[in-house]
A protein has these predicted regions:
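Membrane-water interface of transmembrane alpha-helices
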Residues: 62-82, 143-150
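Short membrane-interface loop/juxtamembrane segments of multi-pass integral membrane proteins
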Residues: 81-98
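Cytosolic juxtamembrane N-terminal segments of multi-pass membrane proteins
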Residues: 1-21, 82-87
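Alpha-helical transmembrane segments and their membrane-interface junctions
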Residues: 103-131
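Canonical alpha-helical transmembrane segments of integral membrane proteins
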Residues: 25-44, 60-63, 100-112
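Alpha-helical transmembrane segments
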Residues: 49-66, 130-133
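Cytosolic juxtamembrane helix at the C-terminal end of the final transmembrane segment
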Residues: 139-163
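Helix-coil boundary and interhelical linker segments in multi-pass alpha-helical membrane proteins
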Residues: 41-52, 117-124
Length: 164
């Protein structure tokens, strides 16, 4: 299955074969290009650098947060009468996005350390710190919430009689 299967499961892509690989490559490339643009912008001197670094944690958090909300909506819709597989797919999407949000916040924190070294100042001080803290809190909160709800659901599932 390999790397493409893992990345595909993160993106929740239903395509198969060559189309799946092309879509995964495209999404990953776009993400790397966007991240690269922000890092390069951050290394430029003056006001541009401060703007880039002030916005970086918020931009990093947009994709995983949107992804989490999509998974949350899908999971809520599956709560009624959908299959176990559908519930698990939605759950997986939310867990991946929660971890993604936490990782992005960590990357933004590393970016702020680089900004301190390069510019001898914290760029966008309050804005940047707020963005990083919000992402770390949201990511960790999502992971804790998801684990707690999952355990409750499994316990409820064990109480039901098995189908023959």
């Amino acid at each position: 299955k390999g790397v493409y299967h893992y990345i595909g499961s993160m993106y929740h892509i239903e395509l198969e074969g060559r189309e799946r690989r092309k879509m995964i490559f495209l999404l990953t490339a776009l993400g790397l290009i966007a991240a690269g643009a922000f890092v390069l912008g951050g290394f430029s001197k003056g006001r541009t650098a401060q703007t880039f670094y002030a916005l970086l944690p918020f931009v990093c958090g947009l994709l995983p947060t949107g992804y989490f909300l999509m998974g949350l909506a899908e999971w809520a819709l599956h709560k009624g009468d959908f299959t176990r597989k559908g519930m698990d797919n939605a759950w997986t999407r939310m867990v991946h996005s929660a971890w993604g949000l936490t990782v992005c916040a960590g990357m933004a924190a590393i970016g702020s350390i680089i900004a301190c070294i390069v510019h001898q100042t914290i760029a966008g001080e309050v804005s940047f710190l707020l963005g990083v803290l919000l992402q770390l809190g949201a990511g960790i909160g999502q992971i804790v919430l998801l684990r707690k709800v999952k355990v409750t659901e499994i316990r409820r599932g064990d109480e039901q009689p098995a189908e023959k």
